[in-house]
Amino acid sequence: MWALALLLMMTLFGGYGVSTHKKLKELQKRTEKAYGMMAVPLDARLERIDRMLAGEEQTLLSGIREARRAVEANREKREDRLCAETRLTLAIAAAAQAVVDEEERAILSRIALLEQDIALCKEDYNAAVQALNGKVRSFPAGLIAAVRKFSVLPLFGESKGALAH
């Protein structure tokens, strides 16, 4: 009789363990998929920022090169050189301002659109992580999670110190 009861309990716990493991794997896959979806706009944002910085340098350099050539060509006469140096100073300021006004605005507006995509992906990712973390922290599923080496994952935008809670 006791053997039958023990066998029945082991079967129930075994079934629970298998179903819990499947649920944990499903939640883990959902989390990985959400992270993969979020990685696309995050990478695009980095690329846009790199382009913005490269474009800024290119704009500055082209205007500065022309003004520098004028300085080199007018080294002999002080008045001409000072005039060329002034053009160089203005070229640097104008190039920097042009970047801020045109290229940077366009790139920043594209980055703002990416930020919206990132915010949506962040919500999906954080929801998946919260579901997985809730299961990992619950009893008795937490026991199975510990044995199967599932761990609590950080939310996007959360510091590592906040995971202790």
Summary of predicted features, one role per range:
Residues 2-165:
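A helix-centric hydrophobic-segment signal that preferentially recognizes long
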